[in-house]
Amino acid sequence: TQKMPDLLERSKRETIVIAQIEDPQGVDEVEEIAATRGVDGIFIGPADLAVGYGKTDQTSPELHAAMLKVGRAAKKNSKPYMSFVPDAMKAAEWNEAYGLSVFFVASEHNWMRKGATHEAQEIHNIKSENTS
């Protein structure tokens, strides 16, 4: 364990602040947010942001424009630009399209589902190889 003064001092050195942009107002104010001293990175939540624009998916021109705007603000202020992505393919796509550089990939539920699906397919392959 650490003494409280030591813990507090350590937390000052190791704590980071990531601004989370998940609604249209955040997009409107992203220049100020990204320029704020003490903000270490910008995270965009495209699913929530799409809902904020009244959309049910992530393909709208409004969302595309918002992701570009947030990316420009992050780059202008030398802040990492980050988001949740379902997989490495989407990370590569968004890196190129929007300049995202930090990715939170999938979720434990998605990994378990993919792993279980893969293992089930392997079992089915064994069965079909030895059945006539």
Where are these regions (language model features)?
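Expand to "…catalyze enediolate/carbanion chemistry for C-C bond making/breaking, isomerization
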Residues: 1-132
